[in-house]
Amino acid sequence: MSKKRHESISITRSFYQLGTPSFPAYLSLGDNAMLIEGGTGATFAIIVEQIKELGIEPERIKYIALTHTHPDHIGAVPHLKRLWPHLKIAAGSVAAKLLKSQRMIKEFRETDRTISEIMINKGEIAELPPELENYIFEVDKVLEEGDRLELGSGIAWTVYHTPGHSPCHISLCEEKEGTLAIGDATGFYVPEKDVFWPNYFDSLEAYCNSIRKLSTLPAQRGALSHNAVVDGWLEGYFQKAIKATESYHLEMLERLGKGEDPEKIALEKAKWVNSLTDIQTFEVMYSLAKLMLARSQSEAGKEKLFTI
């Protein structure tokens, strides 16, 4: 089966979207360069080809900055490190600990292969990425709140802790051009339908606090880790994200309060998510729907969270 061609997208003069729309990575250019997001195993070859087509020397790329450690955001990392050993992995302190876990690596490999199989079936890649003898995710630069990744020519990214989607989540803001690498901190947004699937997998309260925090940063565009770059209406985007979260949470509480079967609610929500995206299997969506139902149930009574 032939593979689909994936071209890079110029967002600004020094910021490019790589990978695929479903699994983007971003390339920031100063005197040095940095990749933001670790992609998937399946997007590794795509990212390498796009960088080559842009005429960027790999030696210029200093860092791969990870927003968080979910499998669909780190999959290209071991392949890139094997190809370009000089790259330094930059991630938050919580992520640095999680990436040392053998259990995490086992779960990553299973999920990454599933994503690759889905992409083959969609014609986005022609073959599975190569199996590696060792999958190494060791973090070279541990990032804390307020740290700056300086690339030169005025391009510098400031680190912000934005947990809630995951405990290890960070976002990065570049003030010269006003670009905010949001990651998954605001959930899964489908621009074609203007619909949000809230993603408070770790904590509803932390998730809402992170959206509120991001809304205060000096940016005009937001680079999401799936599907889109939001440009020119970032304030409205954050408002939509928080309102969608409130609506989802209150729906869960209302339905549970009426005595509906939690399994039935989760199944219905998984079908809804599956109608929005096919980036994961239905089983994964069902598991996440059950997780979010539990999060809403455990964090009832926190309705004052939903303001910006």
Predicted regions and their residues:
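Short Gly/Pro-enriched turn/cap motifs at secondary-structure boundaries
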Residues: 6, 16-17, 133, 138-140, ...
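Residue-level marker for buried hydrophobic side chains located in beta-strands
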Residues: 34, 65, 89, 179-181, ...
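Active-site HxH/HxHxD metal-binding segment of metal-dependent hydrolases
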Residues: 44, 52-150, 243
